[in-house]
Regions:
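A short beta-strand-turn-helix
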Residues: 19-36, 64
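Residue-level recognition of alpha-helix termini/interfacial anchor residues
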Residues: 3, 16-17, 64, 100, ...
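Short coil-to-helix leader/linker segments, especially the first N-terminal amphipathic alpha-helix
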Residues: 4-23
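Structural alpha/beta surface segment adjacent to cysteine/selenocysteine redox centers
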Residues: 34, 39-125, 130, 161, ...
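Generic secondary-structure boundary/loop-capping signal
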Residues: 15-18, 25-26, 74, 105-106, ...
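C-terminal cap of thioredoxin/glutaredoxin-like
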Residues: 1-8, 122-202
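Short, well-ordered amphipathic alpha-helices
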Residues: 23, 57-60, 167-168
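Short clusters of hydrophobic/aromatic residues that line enzyme substrate/ligand-binding pockets
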Residues: 28-29, 115, 182
Length: 202
């Protein structure tokens, strides 16, 4: 979902435990002691999510994550209850069992327009995953409930209507406050403005 003129909502959301927006297994990047957290809700088959991955996330890493000012979390929002978005989300989690969630995340977005069984198997081989364990994990579909719980949080609790969606919050590592929802694909400058606003509240 493109959103060049984003509508910001949820300023002043009450302080709440971080566990309301993260789980113990939510993949994250950056220093978890950083004062600002961005939670992305995304679909590996979404073109606008791929744009964020290619254009905006690298700038956020360079400007904020590498400086210890922001940390980043990825949660699943497959747009359909079945299909390659769900399969890809499961593949990333299965790779995560072998310590390579982010490596699979990157490759899935690099190949998002070509996703299929053959591509996912090739990506697992390229990452030198234990193929037997990866295949067993994929066949089990054991991560589907957690993936759909992410989707439920994005749609029902937070009210996102498409992908990607972002929750930007100030945090002390245990609780969050001053939450801001950014629906849709927005440029780095939009994140920069809101991150800097939150950093000034430290």
């Amino acid at each position: 979902m493109a959103n060049p003129d984003p509508v910001m909502v949820a300023y002043g959301m009450p302080s709440a435990p971080l566990t309301e927006i993260l789980t113990p297994t939510t993949p994250t990047l950056g220093d978890q002691k950083a004062p600002v957290l961005i939670v992305e809700f995304s679909d590996f088959t979404c073109g606008y999510c791929g744009r964020f991955y290619r254009e905006t996330l690298p700038a956020l890493k360079a400007e904020y994550l590498n400086a210890g000012k922001v940390w980043f979390a990825y949660r699943d929002y497959p747009r359909d209850e079945k299909g390659w978005g769900l399969v890809a989300a499961h593949a990333a989690r299965c790779a995560g069992e072998q310590g390579q969630f982010w490596e699979m995340h990157d490759r899935l977005f690099d190949q998002h327009a070509r996703l299929g069984t053959g591509i996912i198997i090739k990506l697992a081989k390229d990452l030198k995953l234990n193929e037997k364990k990866f295949a067993a994990c994929m066949d089990s579909e054991k991560h589907v409930p957690a993936i759909m719980a992410d989707r439920e949080l994005a749609t029902t609790t937070l009210g996102f209507l498409g992908t990607p969606g972002f929750l930007v919050v100030r945090t002390d590592g245990h609780r969050f406050a001053d939450a801001l929802m950014i629906p849709g694909a927005v440029p780095f400058e939009t994140f920069q403005k809101e991150i800097d606003r939150l950093l000034k509240k430290r």
